[in-house]
Amino acid sequence: MVGLVFDQKRYKTELARKYTTFLSKYPEIFSDLVSGSHFDFAIYKSIEEYDVHIQLDIFNVYRNGQGIEIKPGRATNGDLELALSVDAVEKLIQTKNKVDYAQLLGSFYNEPDEKNGWIDFMLHKRTQTLIDMGYGRFAQTAGILEDDDDIYSI
């Protein structure tokens, strides 16, 4: 798989540049997703800013036939938004493979903490559609879901 980052100078923060560079080095993180999957990564300073939708930075990832494309800004008609705290991103970019990344991501969802890191999801498509696109498999690897039926509780 190939990971491509576009327009890195358009990111508002150095953290987003580091995160997109990290994701481009490990495109296998997205190997469970079908080609055409398109979603946003939004970085937030705090839970309060997340609650009122004030992102520190935002970019989108598109899964194509060869790998991923990462671009600044929101996806057009994205599948979901993955909201992440600054602390979570700083820790995630230290991981070395898909499984470690997924498990740490899952811990931020299952045990959110304002100081140590948190993530949340905003789904923009039907849950069954997201399962069919491979998001369920990734969530299982992350420990967010025990099986596909658990996605309905997100």
Regions found by a protein language model. Name each.
Residues M1-I154:
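Feature captures hydrophobic
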